[in-house]
Amino acid sequence: MYEVIQKRKTKIINVLQSPELMRLIEDPSNLGISLHFPVSSLLKSNKCTPMPKLSTYSLASGGFKDWCADIPLDVPPEIDIIDFYWDVILCMESQFILDYNVPSKNKGNNQKSVAKLLKNKLVNDMKTTLKRLIYNENTKQYKNNNSHDGYNWRKLGSQYFILYLPLFTQELIWCKLNENYFHVVLPSLLNSRNVHDNHSTYINKDWLLALLELTSNLNQNFKFEYMKLRLYILRDDLINNGLDLLKNLNWVGGKLIKNEDREVLLNSTDLATDSISHLLGDENFVILEFEC
């Protein structure tokens, strides 16, 4: 599965290496870059597929840091933007695949099979998601339709994000907005050669402030009654580098969230027709929640 996703990730990086984006990345005043798109961009009814939107995190004129300039990214015409969007969605949702549930015998073929199962599930789930979003838009329910399952990482997002946040890491960060919950999966720092002191990276809260600011901006755009940021941090990373973050969690307005009960899931009748959900889980992560 890793090799399959890595190929998709490489394709994404190739698209992101546009002159426009590289200029923003190389500008030292930009402390973060966000690229995002609504899943409604996948609708075949669109006469022209919308381009992803680009925002930068930098020091504003008032002396504070903020996300600004939500403008379309200029993507070369030879790029299949729909394929790009699906690659991003697959990379985000694959973060929850539990490797040990993939049989070791003929693992290469099994990984391809899992990737195909996941993609098929995403396509089917996306049909349901798009129908719901269209209904909410037509009935204007989106204005105060705070979903009861927006917290559920198993639900597809209404928007997907790629973050480049050198305050934390040089790796891409995968995110999605699901109703009034912003889900952010942090990459591992344990094997990063670009971070000299992983421990101090977690202690330095500038990266967390950037994510909170981005979540707050989303809240202003969608006018939800409340907006929450959910961070998914790999357990090994947190144990080795991030315990100080846990110690100071109350000071930064965060709280620990329980992982899902897999016993309930595994005994669910829904799995009778779903051949991939049992391979997904959040138990590799420590989940932190912040209200914005």
From Swiss-Prot:
One of its GO terms (biological process) is viral translational frameshifting. One of its GO terms (cellular component) is cytoplasm. GO terms for molecular function: ornithine decarboxylase inhibitor activity. Interacts with ODC/SPE1 and thereby sterically blocks ODC homodimerization. Belongs to the ODC antizyme family. Ornithine decarboxylase (ODC) antizyme protein that negatively regulates ODC activity and intracellular polyamine biosynthesis in response to increased intracellular polyamine levels. Binds to ODC/SPE1 monomers, inhibiting the assembly of the functional ODC homodimer, and targets the monomers for ubiquitin-independent proteolytic destruction by the 26S proteasome. This is Ornithine decarboxylase antizyme. It comes from Saccharomyces cerevisiae (strain ATCC 204508 / S288c) (Baker's yeast). The gene is OAZ1.
